[in-house]
Amino acid sequence: MKGKILIVDDNAGVLDSLDLFLKNKFEKITTLRNPNQILSLLGQDEYDIVLLDMNFTAGVNIGNEGLFWLRKILKTEPTPIVILITAYGDIELAVTAMKDGATDFVVKPWDNKKLLATLQAAMKLRESQIEVNKLKSRQKLIYQDIN
């Protein structure tokens, strides 16, 4: 699997585990503990997938921080695929995340095979989005040439 992934989680152990597990599966893996740096990183490089934790403040487990950053990420161009990850998953939070634009929702501790399948599906979706955008650009140029 090619592509670039940004993993955002306040837990260094989670970041290390994901980095180790995914290092041969992506061409670039960036890990980040502080979500305040997400938009800066997305402005510097084009990531295909963002794997985003839902909670960053100790003792807070309602997912509002993850939803906040999800909405911010989805306003960036080009828009990466966002998969949320949390230890405090519930159905209502997952539904809200999906309605807000997340592609998938993973609960910690994750199953490596399932996580990999989720990331592969996300990468295929991202590749499809890129191809659609290329076709739209070509179509626009053709229409401009005709007119």
Regions found by a protein language model. Give the residues of each.
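A Lys-centered signature of the CheY-like receiver
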Residues: K108
